């Protein structure tokens, strides 16, 4: 199916879950994960990061998936949506009146007021975007695969150990232990908003709310992401969304990730419209890109949707991505792996 985006909305936010050592590699250190969403969208829109002088990289120096999104879908209009980021980006953005997510082991992740703001304003934004047609919705939230698992489990889904990781070595045992500790405070299963407030983060709710608004106002929502989008889809469904109108586009690296279960999660939530972008970086001359074939990064910042779109247009994806990576390496802002 040809799903051509009119706008690509990138929802950013942070969760203190990403500060737990070993749980997220979406940043060079746990502390730097709070800068990743802002840096991702600054680079995506401007071509260079602003808040710091380097694009987000893993601890091994593997570049952000925003590199791929910018390289292959640069002509698609982007809209940054701040659901609750600890660091606000130095680019224009829509603010949903949310807040950064807290560590759900210690107490509720979000206030009820922030969650209501995100739902109401995200839905209204989605409705306006939906009038334009097909809208891709991506995300940037380090720690998001853990909070996605937490949301799904809190809502009664069997998602234990089934979400992916930006690391080749998915820290599933750590994630499960963290989620179990948080669940001791609540009586699952919870209703959608309760699950987000207690065990979630601002981003998954915002993605669901925007998708809901898009579908309600005649548009076509495409969740551009991996296993995290199972949580967004579950919230969308739980809030009254029609799953027949929802689409999910992700990467081959997510679909083939044996440490997770992307298709299984889509199945238990009930998502039928799933698209896999079959791209390989195995032939790249750059180690930082070949690392994607060994399980690094996999998804994020709408990369799966961007690749799906680029392939539908017949683009030479690897050539475009290598050219952009070369530009960043020359500028000295692409980390320490080439």
From Swiss-Prot:
GO MF, any single term: nicotinate-nucleotide-dimethylbenzimidazole phosphoribosyltransferase activity
InterPro entries on file: Nict_dMeBzImd_PRibTrfase (IPR003200), Nict_dMeBzImd_PRibTrfase_arc (IPR002805), Nict_dMeBzImd_PRibTrfase_sf (IPR036087)
Secretion signal, residue range per the UniProt entry: none
The organism's place on the tree of life at top rank: Archaea
Stated family: Belongs to the UPF0284 family.
HAMAP family documented for this protein: UPF0284
NCBIfam families: nicotinate mononucleotide-dependent phosphoribosyltransferase CobT, PRK04447.1-1, PRK04447.1-5
Name this polypeptide is given: UPF0284 protein PAE0372
Organism: Pyrobaculum aerophilum (strain ATCC 51768 / DSM 7523 / JCM 9630 / CIP 104966 / NBRC 100827 / IM2)
């Amino acid at each position: 199916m040809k799903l051509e985006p009119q706008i690509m909305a990138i929802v950013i936010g942070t969760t203190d879950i990403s500060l737990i050592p070993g749980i997220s590699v979406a940043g060079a250190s746990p502390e730097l994960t709070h800068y990743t969403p802002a840096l991702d969208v600054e680079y995506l829109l401007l071509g260079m990061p602003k808040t710091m002088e380097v694009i987000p990289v893993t601890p091994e120096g593997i570049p952000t998936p925003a590199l791929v999104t910018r390289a292959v879908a640069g002509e698609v209009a982007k809209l940054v949506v701040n659901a609750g980021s600890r660091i606000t980006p130095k680019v224009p953005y829509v603010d949903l009146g949310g807040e950064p997510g807290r560590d759900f082991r210690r107490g509720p992740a979000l206030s009820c007021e922030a969650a209501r703001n995100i739902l109401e304003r995200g839905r209204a934004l989605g409705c306006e975007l939906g009038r334009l047609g097909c809208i891709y919705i991506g995300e940037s939230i380090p720690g998001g695969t853990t909070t996605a698992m937490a949301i799904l489990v809190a809502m009664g889904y069997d998602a234990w150990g089934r979400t992916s990781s930006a690391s080749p070595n998915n820290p599933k045992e750590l994630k499960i232990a963290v989620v179990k500790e948080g669940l001791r405070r609540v009586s699952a299963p919870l209703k959608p908003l309760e699950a987000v407030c207690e065990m979630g983060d601002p981003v998954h709710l915002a993605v669901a709310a925007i998708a809901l608004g898009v579908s309600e106002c005649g548009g076509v929502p495409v969740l551009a992401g991996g296993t995290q989008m199972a949580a967004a889809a579950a919230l969308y469904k739980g809030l009254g969304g029609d799953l027949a109108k929802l689409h999910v586009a992700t990467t081959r690296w997510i679909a083939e990730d044996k440490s997770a279960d992307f298709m299984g999660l889509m199945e238990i939530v009930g998502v039928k419209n799933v698209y896999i972008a079959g791209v390989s970086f195995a032939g790249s001359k750059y180690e930082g890109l070949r690392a994607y074939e060994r399980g690094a990064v996999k998804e994020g910042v709408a990369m799966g949707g961007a690749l799906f779109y680029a392939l539908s247009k017949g683009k030479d994806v690897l050539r475009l991505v290598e050219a952009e990576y070369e530009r960043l390496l020359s500028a000295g802002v692409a980390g320490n792996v080439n």
